[in-house]
Each structure stands twice: as C-alpha cells, then as structure tokens.
Amino acid sequence: VLALGTASRTILTKEERCRVLEEMGGDVLLECPLTEKIRHMKAENFIKEILIGDLQVSYVAVGEDFRFGYERKGTPAMLKEFGKKYGFHTEVLPKEMDGRRKISSTFVREELNRGNMEKFRFLMGTDFSVEGIVEHGRGMGHKYLLPTTNLIPPVEKLMPPNGVYITVSHFRDRSYQGITNVGHKPTVGGEKFIGEEPVSYT
C-alpha cells in the first residue's frame, strides 16, 4: 500500500535524478542552491561568477528553450556569445518531439495524471517507478492468505491516478511480480491509511 501525499508533484525525486545521471555516465554532480543572491543574479553575472569564476567551464550543454538568470533573461544565444569571449563551447540540444508536440515535463505529467503508463514509458524511456518506506498494516492480507506490502512514497513524488496496476517490486536482490492498488484499501472499508490515501501491491 502506497500512502499518497497531496504535495506529490515531481516526476523524479532528487535521488532518482542523481541515479539517472550516474547511470548516464556522470562523474560529479554539483547543485547550486537557490539563495536570494542566486535568485536575483543577472544572467551575465551568473556566467561570469559561477560558470567562469567558480567552475571554470570549458563546455556547456543546454536545451534550446533553456532560460536562466534573473527574470529568465539568459538564453542559449547569450551562452554562445560569452563562450566565444571567455573560451568555452556551448552546445544547444534540440527538443525531442512526439509527432508535432515537444516532449516536456508538462507533457509527461499530463500522461501520468491520465494513467497512460505506456505513453509515460515512451516519453521517459523507462517505466514509472517509486521508492518508499515500508509501513506495517493490520495484517489483513496474511489473514486471507494474500499478504500485502504497505509503502509510503516520497511526498513530492507525482503518482498515477487511483487504480490497479501490474507491477514488479524490487527488494534487496530479488524481484516480485504483483498487483498494485493505488488509492483506498478496497478490502478494509476504503478508509485512509495513516491519514493519507494508500496504495497496495501483493
């Protein structure tokens, strides 16, 4: 059972993003905290102080619609211009398309909110997954010889709509096929679990 928080909204959690980048071959991940100074820093100053001054970059890769700096005035063209002056190369990556529509986080969220898991897999290049903390329940599953696992996902994780899904669960070095119910526990009167709407897989 997965207990869903109302603040769920990110496609990938911070930990998931880090793992994806590592699997893609990244050696080092540096995060820039969004302080008041950074929030109000002009794009030109961000390039000079952070990219050139602190990181001493030689190569920058951004998407074609990438924006940065105060009021989002920094553009890929600006990066290219400064790169010529300060000696770093900027590569601008085109958007991936699905027909005539650009693949974006908004597009992915729409399909996940619809429960279109096949489309989600196509857009993301991988199946939907969630990690969480196992929570002990009432033992109702064991009573009826159908044990379940109660799982609480990260509160910021965007989850699919209520429903029943075919799933694969991974624990330690083993995988288990199962059925996951996202929503209220159907066998216990539909009450909420630890104050949140649960999900269950058996």
Task: Identify what each model region corresponds to.
Residues 1-55:
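Core alpha/beta nucleotide-donor-binding catalytic domains of modification enzymes
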Residues 2, 134, 151:
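Short clusters of hydrophobic/aromatic residues that line enzyme substrate/ligand-binding pockets
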Residues 10, 35, 97, 109, ...:
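Generic anion/oxyanion-binding catalytic loop in active/binding sites
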Residues 14-19, 53-57, 85-87, 115-118, ...:
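Glycine-rich loops and low-complexity Gly/Arg-rich segments
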Residues 33, 64, 182-184:
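Short secondary-structure boundary segments
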Residues 40-147, 162, 170:
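Classical nucleotidyltransferase
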Residues 137-201:
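Phosphate/ribose-recognition catalytic cores of enzymes acting on nucleotide-derived substrates
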